[in-house]
């Protein structure tokens, strides 16, 4: 009879965890490779379709007939997944992303380039884009008409690892336009190339903050407590709306100063800036008293809560009607307090897009004037 082998529980558990980790990583690599292969394949299928159509008639009826016939043949040979609407999307995908090749996300470019090494190209002279997202993400992105906005969403989606649902929401709520409206005009063009970088405290605040996902009805009167409860209940979405790096710490945080009790509505910590972020919710117009109270909260946290290595505390006042003049007159120019108007419904997309277009045209005109002055 063979000798029984007794294994150490800790050793076998270590082995088990190593195997699980290895298999998990392998599956992730396979999933990434499949995504890259699918997107690149559809990009080149779109290229084949467009090139075929260019050799024939240019009428819309001709293109529709081509896609319907191709759909029938591909379905017969390859099975489901090649409907007329799918081929129409593939064709549009190539048309959109072959213009300027807006993709350029750093995280997956190396993997994509490795995969591309042996990939058959329809035309050798065609430069290759770098696709870092799934096909589902690109179905959303290619419907964004503004190339700068599309590039911005693609970069942000890759860096922040947004799900399809999160990307759809950010596009639908005009994140690009809202960020553009909240920043200096000269920074509008930078958004499309770099995404939203965090260099100073004001960069973590998106203005105005859209709260329509809270499900609050129009023209209703809300107490601060009800609004706060709604925000707490959907904290994950709210953090996404606020910006990058927010970690929730507490609500109605109490502290005592000069034998008086004070309560901070919401306390966050921003891991990217390494600082506390205090939020106060106001339903009525912003007053001098509100600003003074927030300044006191900020001073308390800076003196008694934050560590030496951490940056100064940020205070944010959320109010229905922002009065920038009041903020400027009441606070020092470099104060870390900002008033962000929040709105219960999606912004008027047409108006926001018109504003951004106006700013872009103004920016281009100014750049042209600068070039002319340099040559004079």
Language-model regions, residue ranges each:
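Basic, low-complexity intrinsically disordered segments
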Residues: 1-376
